[in-house]
Design a protein with these regions (language model features):
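Extracytoplasmic "Venus flytrap"
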Residues: 25-41, 56
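Extracytoplasmic ligand-binding site segments that recognize negatively charged/polar headgroups
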Residues: 32-39, 61-62, 68, 75-209
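Short alpha-helix C-terminal cap/hinge motif
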Residues: 40-54
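A ligand-binding cleft/hinge motif common to bilobed small-molecule-binding domains
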Residues: 85-90, 206, 211-229
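Periplasmic-binding protein-like
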Residues: 107, 121, 184-188, 193-194, ...
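A bilobed periplasmic-binding-protein/Venus flytrap-type ligand-binding module shared by bacterial periplasmic
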Residues: 124-131, 172, 243-254, 273-274
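An extracytoplasmic/periplasmic, membrane-proximal ligand-sensing/linker region
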Residues: 178-180, 282-327
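Mature extracytoplasmic/periplasmic domains
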Residues: 249-305
Length: 327
């Protein structure tokens, strides 16, 4: 598995959080966040808490595999920003925690397991406006199977990326997971170029290496905000808007540090930051959404069943791997 480690120096604590003891000076964080988000947010955590953060950055699936492998001797304190269904499916690896501002979380984003919501994420299409004219943009998931898009669509591998698994499950929620639904997805799959990293997908589209990318709204928004030749498309046949999650690791070496990290991530200041600068949807009731994004009440949303997505993961991954093997 491919992992990237970032070690960040602590900054002075503020009155927002209690100063940690010497035993609490370092918190170990495993995250699927892209490097630019980690680099933007971690200094804010350190200013608020005075702690050092050791960050391991990897795909969602690799993170879960690593936590499971380390189960007898956990190395991580907290998992930050991976697919909620992965956390739901691996609930036994997680430690339950009710954060200080739990009641501020919108009920729609609360889960049933030992994980907590972090932000709201929306699955979208991202298109390169130099490679496609507006009339050529895909409007639905089934449009992605059109012959003109052969080798023009970038998607992360669903066995490595939590967001890619959400995209697969979104498609199967809309069209069913019967043989007919999988047959429809197979037609789309034939047009895909697979990446091992979900963070690479929007970059490929922005740079013109792909005409279309299946990605998260916030990843696409950063390139729109940066002036790239890209546009965000919300599928007319429906898409998913769900929480990505975070959780304490069971047996964490610094449980108090992990709790402090989660409290910080759910704070009003952090939620405002991830919304206004990073394009995520807030999970707090009192947070203001980003005005530049399409209001969710104007997006056709499906009912995304996180528990079913977790329960079906192995079955879906077996079928996904069959598709990969048959390419």
């Amino acid at each position: 598995m491919t992992m990237k480690r970032v070690s960040v120096l602590a900054l002075a604590a503020t009155v927002a959080f209690a100063a940690p003891t010497s035993a609490q000076q370092r918190v170990s964080v495993y995250t699927a966040h892209t490097a630019n988000i980690v680099e933007r947010l971690l200094p804010e955590f350190e200013k608020a808490t005075g702690m050092k953060a050791d960050v391991v950055k990897a795909g969602s699936g690799d993170i879960i595999n690593r936590v499971r492998a380390e189960r007898a001797n956990p190395k991580a304190d907290v998992i930050w920003s991976i697919g909620a269904e992965l956390l739901e499916a691996n609930n036994e690896l997680l430690e339950a925690y009710r954060p200080k501002e739990f009641d501020k979380i919108a009920d729609a984003f609360k889960g049933t397991g030992n994980w907590l919501p972090y932000t709201g994420i929306v699955n979208v299409f991202m298109v390169n406006t130099k490679k496609l004219k507006p009339e050529e943009y895909p409007k639905t998931w089934l449009d992605l199977a059109k012959p003109q898009y052969k080798n023009q669509i970038s998607m992360a591998a669903a066995d490595k990326s939590g967001s890619s698994y959400m995209q697969l499950n979104t498609f199967l929620t809309i069209y069913g997971d019967s043989n007919d639904g999988w047959s429809k997805f197979k037609s789309v799959f034939a047009n895909l170029n697979l990446s091992n990293s979900s963070g690479a997908v929007p970059r490929f589209v922005n740079d013109g290496e792909a005409a279309i990318g299946l990605t998260l709204e916030d990843n696409a928004y950063l390139f729109v905000k940066g002036g790239g030749p890209v546009a965000i498309i919300y599928p007319e046949d429906g898409t998913s808007a769900i929480a990505d999650g975070m959780a304490l690791v069971k047996g964490a070496p610094n449980l108090a540090g992990g709790k402090a990290f989660i409290d910080w991530a759910l704070s009003s200041a952090t939620q405002d930051l991830v919304v206004q600068e990073l394009g995520r949807r807030p999970i707090r009731k009192d947070a203001k959404p980003l005005g530049n994004l399409k209001p969710l009440d104007q997006v056709k949303l499906i009912k995304y069943d996180i528990k079913k997505a977790a329960d079906k993961r192995q079955e879906y991954m077996d079928k996904w791997n069959d598709l990969v093997a048959s390419r």
